[in-house]
UniProtKB/Swiss-Prot annotation:
GO BP terms in the entry: translation
Keyword Isomerase recorded: no
Role description: Located on the platform of the 30S subunit, it bridges several disparate RNA helices of the 16S rRNA. Forms part of the Shine-Dalgarno cleft in the 70S ribosome.
Entry's Gene Ontology molecular function annotations: rRNA binding; structural constituent of ribosome
Protein name stated in the entry: Small ribosomal subunit protein uS11
Oligomeric and partner information: Part of the 30S ribosomal subunit. Interacts with proteins S7 and S18. Binds to IF-3.
Keyword Metal-binding: no
Protein family per UniProt: Belongs to the universal ribosomal protein uS11 family.
Pfam families: Ribosomal_S11
TM ranges: none
InterPro entries: Ribosomal_uS11, Ribosomal_uS11_bac-type, Ribosomal_uS11_CS, Ribosomal_uS11_sf
Cellular component GO terms, alphabetical: ribonucleoprotein complex; ribosome
Superkingdom classification of source: Bacteria
Amino acid sequence: MADDKKSVKKEKKVKKKEKKIVPRGKVYITASFNNTIVTITDMAGNTISWSTSGAMGFRGSKKSTPYAAQIAAGNAAEKAMDSAGLQEVDVMVSGPGIGRESAIRSLVARGLNIKMIKDVTPLPHNGCRPRKRRRV
């Protein structure tokens, strides 16, 4: 009786993910002093692909370089173009990092058409008290 239950196995059906064609999307570039994060979404905000300088193998102070931002943006663009057929994007840039401009140049070099570039860095209208100034 127990042997019959063991021999019956249910086969799981695995559905393949459908390849969505997204001709237009948004690119969010967050350039901090320590890292650069590139996220590519469709127009509704659903993530298609992402990449960071750290995920590209850069460590420590090399993560914050323009070259690391260029490699990360290029990788994210390649993934988005391959998986979703992305062609044109709106770019939202935030943060004070030095990888902002090189990341945008990398997107153009990969063949994405940029329709709009917008700086969405959050600036307070004299809100919370900032942390103390760094003295070197």
